[in-house]
């Protein structure tokens, strides 16, 4: 089974109430090879919500207590991001997920890039909280940007 970010599956769960539908993800869902999950909703957030970014590091730093996740209003929402990451990990284990495709740049789901914590659109290399936790547990995580190259293998 493959787990995919709910926003990539066309669900309007992003912080601003939109989606980021990826056609390849839709194909995986339609063929019942994938299940959609949103770590932020699993962590207790609603839609819409304030955008949030990691301050002082990356997702692994958040898990190890060296960085935090803060929303644009200045609220520390670290605990909710960690809770959502653990809920996503539980789902990955219960589904025996072999691959997880998450939304790049997100403080939860980024796999190569995250926003830099300045709320101005700047990005830095790094991974989000959920991606870091899944990888620490040996689960492969890729972004939607890497999916096209993997689709033939996944659909075969």
Enumerate the predicted regions with their spans.
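Glycine-rich phosphate-binding loop signature in dinucleotide/nucleotide-binding domains
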Residues: 93-96
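Short catalytic/ligand-binding loop motif for oxyanion handling, primarily in non-cytosolic enzymes
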Residues: 12, 46, 108-111
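Divalent-metal-activated hydrolytic enzyme cores
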Residues: 12-15, 23, 42, 60-87, ...
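Active-site loop/lid in soluble adenylation, ligation, and acyl-transfer enzymes
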Residues: 5-18
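Short, well-ordered beta-to-alpha junction loops that form the rim of enzyme active sites
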Residues: 7, 103-106, 146
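Extreme N-terminal starter segment of soluble prokaryotic enzymes
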Residues: 1-3
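Short, surface-exposed acidic-centric catalytic microdomains
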Residues: 20-70
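Internal, conserved structured core segments that host functional sites
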Residues: 99-114, 118
């Amino acid at each position: 089974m493959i787990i995919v970010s709910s926003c990539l599956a066309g669900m309007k769960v992003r912080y601003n109430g939109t989606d980021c539908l990826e056609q390849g993800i839709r194909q995986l869902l339609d063929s019942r090879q994938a299940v959609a999950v949103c770590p932020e909703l699993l962590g207790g957030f609603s839609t819409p919500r304030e955008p949030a970014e990691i301050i002082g590091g990356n997702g692994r730093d958040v898990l190890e207590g060296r960085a935090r996740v803060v929303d644009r209003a200045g609220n520390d929402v670290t605990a909710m991001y960690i809770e959502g990451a653990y809920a996503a990990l539980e789902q990955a284990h219960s589904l025996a997920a072999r691959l997880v495709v998450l939304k790049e740049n997100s403080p939860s789901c980024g796999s190569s890039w995250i926003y830099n914590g300045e709320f101005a659109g700047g990005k830095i290399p790094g991974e989000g909280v959920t991606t870091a936790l899944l990888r620490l547990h040996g689960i492969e995580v890729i972004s939607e940007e890497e999916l096209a190259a993997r689709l033939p293998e996944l659909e075969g």
